[in-house]
Every structure is written in structure tokens, then in C-alpha cells.
Swiss-Prot record:
SUPFAM superfamilies: Hypothetical protein VC0424. It comes from Pantoea ananatis (strain LMG 20103). GO terms for molecular function: endoribonuclease inhibitor activity; enzyme binding. The lineage of its organism: Bacteria, Pseudomonadati, Pseudomonadota, Gammaproteobacteria, Enterobacterales. The keyword Transcription regulation does not apply. This is Regulator of ribonuclease activity B. Residues 119-140 have a biased composition (Acidic residues). Residues 115-140 are annotated as: Disordered. GO terms for cellular component: cytoplasm. Keywords: Cytoplasm. It comes from the Bacteria. Its main location: cytoplasm. Interacts with the C-terminal region of Rne. Pfam families: RraB. The gene is rraB.
Length: 140
């Protein structure tokens, strides 16, 4: 898929995910963990992309093997960030990561997050983390 077509598809998917979460009652003001999914059949390439993402300030999960429907195996990692559930912020991260992984022939497989209950008791309300209104989504 061409670069611009992939980004446009991801922008549409981002808006759909956000819309569905909010329609289901997820807290619009919560701090969300965004999990960007990467995969590759070459571990070394995936590792290089993961290291570059880490250098940009993202958290990176341990690599895992995943068997696909056709029986082939790929290696996967999640690239994590925290922020507001705002399409523009997520779009910026997606574009940054798609550009990054293209250098290593790694697949960007989309992103996801979790429902945030607006009525849940927050055990770590005093942890000092707040949504940064000036965050443009891009990590440095």
C-alpha cells in the first residue's frame, strides 16, 4: 500500500476508533495508553525499528512471536505512548512511526487503546500526570 494511502486509511481508522470509544461511554478526558502495533518477519529489522522508537521517547514492549492465519510466523512489538484521545495527536504519532518503520521494511499494523470508565476510582490520581494541552503527539 502506498505511503499516503496507508496514512489516509489510518486517519479514517483513528476517527472510527475514537468515535466508537466515546459512543460506548469511554471518558473523553482520560489519559489513554496508545499501543501502536509493529510486525516483521525479520527480528533484526523489527529490533532496529523498536530501538529508534525508544530513542524518540516511546515505550516499547518485549518482542513476541505471532502465528498468522496462513501459518507463517512474524515478530511483533507494541510502541506505547500516553496522551489525550485526540485524532490529531494520534495521526502525528502514526505518521512518525510509519516513516520510521519504512526504513526497516517493518509493517505498521495500526493502533489500539482501552476503554476508560469515567466512573472508575483512580488509584493514582495524585501521580502528577495530566494531559499536556501543548502535546502535538510527535516524540523527540
Amino acid at each position: 500500500m502506498a505511503f499516503e494511502a496507508l496514512l489516509e486509511e489510518q486517519r479514517e481508522e483513528t476517527r472510527l476508533i475514537i468515535e466508537e470509544l466515546l459512543e460506548d461511554g469511554s471518558d473523553p478526558d482520560a489519559l489513554y495508553t496508545i499501543e501502536h502495533h509493529l510486525s516483521c518477519n525479520n527480528f533484526d529489522s523489527l529490533e532496529k525499528a523498536a530501538v529508534d522508537a525508544f530513542k524518540l521517547g516511546y515505550e516499547v514492549t518485549e518482542p513476541e512471536e505471532l502465528e498468522l492465519e496462513d501459518g507463517t510466523t512474524v515478530m511483533c512489538v507494541d510502541i506505547l505512548s500516553e496522551g489525550a484521545l485526540k485524532a490529531e495527536l494520534i495521526d502525528a504519532q502514526v505518521e512518525q512511526l510509519v516513516n520510521l518503520v519504512a526504513k526497516y521494511n517493518v509493517d505498521y499494523d495500526g493502533w489500539g487503546t482501552y476503554f476508560e470508565d469515567p466512573n472508575a476510582q483512580d488509584d493514582d490520581e495524585d501521580d502528577g500526570e495530566a494531559i499536556d494541552e501543548d502535546d502535538n503527539g510527535i516524540r523527540h
